[in-house]
């Protein structure tokens, strides 16, 4: 099926899209699928200008950290946690606090008062596999509003829920635009695909697109189109 989608994407009908330098946009078919199918499954509703396609979740994490971290913006993440989040934060300008997690994930009540950024994996914590319950999620959002900080949610491995339905994304509870959401097709398709996405308010996505352009121009248009066709099967 993937081979058939690749052949289709190479056809004359798609040639105009594939021969276009999309540094200022992403494949419209892929963006439409993400907005109309992928995100609603997680309880998230976003416009096309609120989504950026990235080279996997790691690229999205790096872009988020580059845009949000400064010396005067202390960051918090989980301990233990996803090693790439920890390493990306260590390389940033922000002072970083690693908060121990319990069986329910990160406890929002333990956040330092000067927190300005929280990076977490609430739906499937790495490496414990725990899921942050609804009460803690709401407490975290309330703390974010009270302390005026931003949350980056890496929705790692949310599909791998064997004991019941996947918990709604933290972003689905966000009414103030404080949660940046990162997703990837690595688990649902295959790890080598390296197609992810970042969901955030449109002004921040515009800045993220500028940064992405300086880093790698854009993810290959042909790969984006094949992915869109494959997902729509």
Where are these regions (language model features)?
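PLP-dependent aminotransferase class I/II
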Residues: 180-233
């Amino acid at each position: 099926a993937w081979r058939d989608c690749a052949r289709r994407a190479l056809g004359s009908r798609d040639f105009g899209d594939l021969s276009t330098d999309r540094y200022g946009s992403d494949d419209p078919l892929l963006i439409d699928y993400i907005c109309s199918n992928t995100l609603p499954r997680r309880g998230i509703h976003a416009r096309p200008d609120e989504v950026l396609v990235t080279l996997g979740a790691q690229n999205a994490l790096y872009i988020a950290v580059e845009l949000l971290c400064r010396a005067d913006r202390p960051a918090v993440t989980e301990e233990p946690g996803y090693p790439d989040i920890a390493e990306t934060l260590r390389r940033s300008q922000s002072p970083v606090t690693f908060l121990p997690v319990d069986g329910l994930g990160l406890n929002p009540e333990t956040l330092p008062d000067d927190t300005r950024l929280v990076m977490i994996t609430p739906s499937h914590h790495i490496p414990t596999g725990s899921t942050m319950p609804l009460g803690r999620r709401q407490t975290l959002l309330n703390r974010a509003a009270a302390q005026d900080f931003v949350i980056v949610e890496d929705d790692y491995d949310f599909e791998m829920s064997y004991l019941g339905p996947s918990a709604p994304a933290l972003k689905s509870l966000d009414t103030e635009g404080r949660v940046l959401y990162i997703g990837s097709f690595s688990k649902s398709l295959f790890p080598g695909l390296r197609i992810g996405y970042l969901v955030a308010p449109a002004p921040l996505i515009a800045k993220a697109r500028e940064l992405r352009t300086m880093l790698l121009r854009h993810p290959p248009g042909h790969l984006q189109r094949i992915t869109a066709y494959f997902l729509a099967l």
